[in-house]
Amino acid sequence: MSIIQEFKEFAIKGNMMDLAIGVIIGGAFGKIVDSLVKDIIMPLITVITGGGVDFSQKFIVLGANPNNLQSLDALQKAGINVLTYGNFLTILINFLILAWVVFLMVKLLNKLRRDKNEPEAPAATPEDIQLLREIRDELKKQA
């Protein structure tokens, strides 16, 4: 089978549309998580830690700082090499939250699929039917 034929089958089956929709929703969801971390979680962490922690301003100056600049913006504008580990921590928190939410969504979808695919348990045999079967079996043994 040629690669073009495989691509046509892939596109016709709807997998391409599913993928496109997933990418679009994923991009929008990523923005929601970014906002959650930046606008809600990080300010709460700052308040909990007594206002002294602002991850966006956490950095280490790598190399010489001849003008003794103190702010991250000033250091970056001056072209001084800066290790911005606070930004990394914020992105790491974003990732962990996003991974957790995706995990919960997959877990929920798997549970819903499992519930759909499980065959229904057969209904319990009523007592009178069970009694009639036992009587029939006894009569067969005696005959």
Curated annotation (Swiss-Prot):
It holds the Pfam family MscL. GO terms for molecular function: mechanosensitive monoatomic ion channel activity. It is a multi-pass membrane protein. Keywords: Cell inner membrane, Cell membrane, Ion channel, Ion transport, Membrane, Transmembrane, Transmembrane helix, Transport. GO terms for cellular component: plasma membrane. Belongs to the MscL family. Signal peptide: none annotated. This is Large-conductance mechanosensitive channel. Gene3D superfamilies: Large-conductance mechanosensitive channel, MscL, domain 1 (1.10.1200.120). The lineage of its organism: Bacteria, Pseudomonadati, Pseudomonadota, Gammaproteobacteria, Moraxellales. Channel that opens in response to stretch forces in the membrane lipid bilayer. May participate in the regulation of osmotic pressure changes within the cell. Homopentamer. PROSITE patterns: MSCL. The chain crosses the membrane at residues 10-30, 40-60, 86-106. It is found in: Cell inner membrane.
